[in-house]
Regions:
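Structural transition elements
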Residues: 338-380, 401-403
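Extracytoplasmic/peripheral linker and loop segments enriched in polar/acidic and small residues
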Residues: 15, 419-432, 460-526, 549
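Long beta-strand-rich cores associated with HINT superfamily self-processing modules
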Residues: 523-549
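Surface-exposed binding/hinge segments that line
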Residues: 137-196
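N-terminal lobe/hinge region of extracytoplasmic solute-binding protein
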Residues: 46-95, 213
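Gly/Pro-rich hinge or "lid" segments in bacterial periplasmic/extracellular proteins
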Residues: 174-244, 248, 258
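Ligand/substrate-recognition segments at binding pockets and active sites
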Residues: 225-227, 369-450, 521
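Ligand-site clamp/hinge motif
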Residues: 236-280
Length: 549
């Protein structure tokens, strides 16, 4: 009997020892696994504050970049700016190429659990073209039936050529065939909106993290509407969440490159843009990644506010007084190149000859450096306006690089045009955009990056009725060329190209704006950060497939 008891006790002890050993082994294995699996968290910088998370009202690259990562549309761009299906699962185009029937995936949801439906697109697009919304990107809808008439207040929003032909099917009616329409469908302004949430918050929708709903890979948290730091968290409701590896992205607005570099060196930033003096110093850094970018920096004149700026000779004098080569070599130093015109080199080529658009559209003696001629033309323009000198203020964003560019322009223009008294005002980017939209400026230093790979994305900006044209510049020949490209020549590839080249030449000859340089993108990227997709057309970064290795 005692032997039996001893045997049972021994067996029990052995079982306990085995269990304890198993627990210890499991813990060690788990610890080793945890130690070998890096935390899927990255730290990034932003050059400016978020202006809005409302897709119908955004007008700046940083806010668009944020929306690209928290929302999703029918298509998404790859690194070359080519659209691929996202929420769309099937696209059927009619024989005359004017009707698009698009099936939408059934498993897409908003971050509040609501399903993403065809009606969400209908509501979003109707809201965007409604003149009450005052969306800055209404031109993207111009190919859709009745869009322009609705935006001009001539028709009701219900007449827009988009309908839900089922819970998960969208039917789009175009005015005419448009070869680049799929690229337009990938733009953020054409993403869907959850009507219930937008109606709940009204005008406050998109003004903070908590007053926005998301359907993309991440959700925005911690943005109050005015602060300079926020987070992107993995969206548990995202339909394709299995491809999303990052759990958290920490963003911080950093306007001084030196501050960003210090943080990068100490491991507190995983990716940072390189500009100015840093570009030269870090040229051989093994973390440096160089990328082309379809973006142009330019001076915009407010001819409605300052009458003298409506004088062509004054504008041409200002343009010829700027040494663009010196600007990119001594201030930017990041591979940016002087711009002869608005449409950047390397984006579009003549369908017949293969010649680059920028080269074909260049106009002599409009963007070269000629201080002697600049002085003569400026003086001539002043005389025509009955003035002895001109005093204006250049409005610019207050990040370090933009301030340096503004100061350079002030220096070179003051030197070459003694009759020009130019002062500089630098303010937060979001405030600057608001002032420009409300025409509260004399001169403005601003940039535009392509919405898609076609010259029209730049040239459409300066038609007389464009919502982006706050300058007051208007030219009938320019308007006609753009109109022809969008209508009578829309299906004739070469004729359309010729229309756009003509428009670009008119803009350059008249100096409706003064282009400065084509931007280039350079970043320091930590070797452990993989899978970031950079779109060289619009300059956006997608973290959907990014991960820490």
């Amino acid at each position: 009997m005692e032997n039996g008891k001893k045997k049972k006790i021994l067996i029990a002890l052995i079982v306990i020892v085995i269990l304890i050993a198993g627990v210890i082994f499991w813990k060690r294995k788990n610890q080793q696994k945890t130690a070998s699996t890096p935390a899927q968290t990255i730290n990034l910088s932003a050059s400016s504050e978020i202006s809005s998370l409302d897709i119908s009202k955004i007008d700046d690259r940083n806010s668009f970049n944020q929306v690209d990562n928290v929302d999703e549309g029918l298509f998404r761009y790859d690194k070359n700016g080519v659209p691929h299906k996202a929420l769309a699962t099937k696209v059927k185009i009619s024989k005359d190429q004017t009707v698009y029937t698009i099936d939408i995936r059934h498993d897409a949801k908003w971050s509040n659990g609501d399903p993403v439906t065809a009606e969400d697109f209908v509501y979003s697009w109707q809201r965007a073209v409604d003149p009450k919304t005052a969306s800055p990107y209404t031109y993207l809808f111009s190919d859709i039936k009745n869009a322009d008439e609705i935006n001009q207040g001539k028709k009701a929003v219900s007449q827009l050529g988009v309908k839900a032909s089922g819970k998960y099917q969208l039917k789009i009616q175009l005015n005419k065939p448009q070869s680049y329409f799929k690229m337009v469908l990938a733009r953020e302004t054409l993403y869907p909106l959850d009507k219930k949430v937008v109606k709940k918050y009204g005008k406050a929708y998109g003004t903070s993290s908590k007053k926005t709903v998301y359907n993309g890979p991440f959700i925005n948290t911690g943005w109050t509407g005015t602060n300079d730091s926020w987070k992107l968290k993995k969206n548990p409701y995202y339909w394709d969440k299995k491809v999303v590896k990052l759990q958290t992205i920490n963003f911080q607005v950093i306007k001084q490159p030196s501050t960003a570099y210090n943080l990068y060196q100490t491991g507190k930033l995983d990716l940072m843009p390189v500009v100015g003096e840093q570009a030269k110093q870090l040229e051989n850094n093994q973390d440096l990644v160089k990328r082309p970018l379809a973006a142009t920096e330019y001076l915009q004149y407010n001819m409605s506010k300052v009458k003298a700026l409506g004088n062509k000779n004054i504008r041409l004098g200002i343009s010829l007084a700027i040494n663009r080569s010196q600007l990119v070599k001594t201030i930017l130093k990041n591979g940016s190149t002087p711009a002869d015109g608005l449409v950047p080199a390397g984006m579009s080529k003549n369908p017949k000859t293969g010649e680059d658009f920028a080269k074909e559209a260049a106009v002599k003696n409009t963007a070269n450096y000629d201080p002697k001629l600049a002085k003569q033309l400026f003086a001539k323009g002043l005389k025509e306006e009955g003035l002895k000198n001109l005093q204006v203020t250049l409005l610019a964003a207050n990040d370090d690089t933009t301030k340096q560019i503004a100061e350079y322009l002030q220096s070179v223009l003051s030197k070459n045009l003694p009759q020009l008294k130019l002062s500089v005002s630098t303010i937060p980017f979001t405030v600057m955009i608001s002032d420009v939209d409300n025409k509260k400026y004399d001169l403005n230093l601003i940039s535009w990056s392509a919405d898609f790979a076609d010259p029209i994305t730049f040239l459409q900006l300066f038609t007389s009725n464009s919502s982006e044209n706050s300058s007051g510049w208007s030219n009938a020949e320019y308007d006609q060329a753009i109109n022809d490209s969008n209508n009578k020549d829309a299906n004739n590839q070469q004729a359309r190209w010729n229309d756009l080249v003509k428009a670009a030449k008119v803009l350059a000859s008249d100096q409706g704006i003064t282009t400065l340089y084509k931007s280039n993108s350079e970043d320091l990227v930590k070797p452990h950060l993989k899978g970031v997709v950079f779109n060289g057309i619009n300059g956006h970064y997608s973290y959907r497939t990014a991960y820490v290795k």
